[in-house]
Design a protein with these regions (language model features):
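Conserved loop->alpha-helix
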Residues: 1-212
Length: 212
């Protein structure tokens, strides 16, 4: 479980592509490296990954992860290169404060950044997707973008876009400031909303079937 509060941004130290597998790694800062063990779960751009190897260094803890084909297909992991900056969050501990909203680290797909509007104290980013998961997105509802818990500021279902507002603090602590138009971001929809929408759709379908 994660909270959607990005704890660090890390630059990938290596990316290695193998048959049906992508391996990547980065140096986890000392502030986040306590109690990390092999098999630990860490969210990278919001996607839950398992630590497959680790080694101490002067800078911190070098950790390595594996991404199989399925993970690459539905996330922005397939675009990783050495030097790519990613959002990182350790899994939440019991009784930890949930500063954002509860996340599983299970990505439903990606959205494309279609526009950026900036002024002195705010940045609005608009994302687009024609994927089925867009039906779970609602104005003023939660959404996780690259692992960051955010509020949907605007939604245009006809254009298949949604917008988020970012304060300077969020831009400073995440990789959003490095995004450009056309970049893909990982999306996790809010789980309770997904359950409600799916339940309503199922009940309505059953009622229509009975009426026929």
């Amino acid at each position: 479980m994660y909270t959607g509060i990005v704890q660090a941004t890390c630059a990938l130290s290596f990316v290695e592509r193998k048959p049906n597998l992508l391996q990547f790694g980065f140096c986890l800062p000392e502030t986040l490296s306590a109690d990390v063990t092999l098999g630990a779960s860490i969210a990278v751009n919001g996607c839950c990954f398992t630590v497959t190897s680790m080694a101490r260094s002067v800078q911190g803890l070098n950790v390595t992860f594996d991404a199989i084909d399925e993970t690459q297909a539905i996330t922005n992991v397939k675009h990783f290169e050495q030097g790519t900056v990613v959002n990182v969050e350790r899994s939440a501990k019991q009784n930890a404060e949930v500063g954002g909203h509860v996340l599983s680290g299970h990505i439903v797909g990606t959205a494309e950044l279609v526009s950026i509007e900036k002024d002195e104290n705010r940045c609005r980013m608009t994302f687009g997707s024609d994927a089925p998961w867009l039906k779970y997105v609602f104005e003023k509802g939660y959404i996780a973008v690259n692992g960051a818990s955010l509020t949907v500021a605007a939604l245009d279902r006809s254009a298949q876009t949604f917008a988020i507002n970012l304060i300077p603090e969020t831009l400073e602590r995440t990789n959003f400031s490095l995004l450009s138009v056309g970049d893909p971001v990982n999306i996790e929809v809010e789980s309770q909303t997904q359950v409600i929408v799916d339940t309503v759709e199922r009940v309505m379908a059953e009622r229509y079937a009975q009426a026929d």
